[in-house]
UniProtKB/Swiss-Prot annotation:
Entries under InterPro entries matching the protein: Mitochondrial_sb/sol_carrier, Mt_carrier_dom_sf, SLC25A3/Pic2/Mir1-like
Solcar repeats: 16-100, 109-193, 210-289
Location relative to the cell: Mitochondrion inner membrane
Description of what induces expression: By salt stress.
Organism: Arabidopsis thaliana (Mouse-ear cress)
Keywords: Membrane, Mitochondrion, Mitochondrion inner membrane, Repeat, Transmembrane, Transmembrane helix, Transport
GO biological process: mitochondrial phosphate ion transmembrane transport; response to salt stress
Transmembrane intervals: 16-36, 75-94, 112-132, 168-187, 209-229, 269-289
More info: Plants overexpressing MPT1/PHT3;3 display increased sensitivity to salt stress.
Protein name: Mitochondrial phosphate carrier protein 1, mitochondrial
Primary subcellular site in the record, as a coarse category: mitochondrion
Amino acid sequence: MTRVKSKLDEELSSPWFYTVCTMGGMLSAGTTHLAITPLDVLKVNMQVNPVKYNSIPSGFSTLLREHGHSYLWRGWSGKLLGYGVQGGCRFGLYEYFKTLYSDVLPNHNRTSIYFLSSASAQIFADMALCPFEAIKVRVQTQPMFAKGLLDGFPRVYRSEGLAGFHRGLFPLWCRNLPFSMVMFSTFEQSVEFIYQKIIQKRKQDCSKAQQLGVTCLAGYTAGAVGTIISNPADVVLSSLYNNKAKNVLQAVRNIGFVGLFTRSLPVRITIVGPVITLQWFFYDAIKVLSGFPTSGGVKKPVDAAKLSV
């Protein structure tokens, strides 16, 4: 048993495993974000102009009436490529840092490992995403700005230089770091809870279909909780990109405390919950097809008295 466990640990820290995780993250994040581009267009416009776009049904009606169906897919290339790159870094580096921190911090509890791993991965993931996000938000809210990435990148560079591509990096970190930390930790804890308290079986004793079902349930829970935590920074980010405010402090004053937590929250939950669920499902399905177990658990559980999932 020890030899089998040791062999599995070696496989889960191999270059091939991290490659699979990175590719799985790219495919799952890029495709799911592409699929919900119309909702994202509505969300960004609700954040920038909440009076005009004050609900999901009326917001869609206004966009369709004024701009047509094609407008709902503006920024699709930024969604596909930007969030694909971000997803590869987020998932691939999370697995790497989780193994690393489990080895160098053996006496810390698992929640600390999840927080540190997800935060470390997200820092690099957002640095990769930021240039794409800078173009995407402008394309979605400023009809005359550009059609997509090809003409959007040169325009930002001419008007703002390289700094324009990373103008929103700090608020992006403020949005995504709490989201990622809460999302990954909630996912891991949810997986453990489902196996121990609901199914009451070890992961390896469940079928692959059951394991993927657990992944979906834990993924939706993680996405919903993370959305609420990250909503204020998401609203501020849209305000900055559309020149509604010169800095974060001014944006917060303009939006108001209540608005930070409520503006566009319903549409964000509508978007993020299913998206995170599908991301985890596709991600774990790719891992299973590659011969690896589904996600959940650390390499070296700190509390040996409990079953590791």
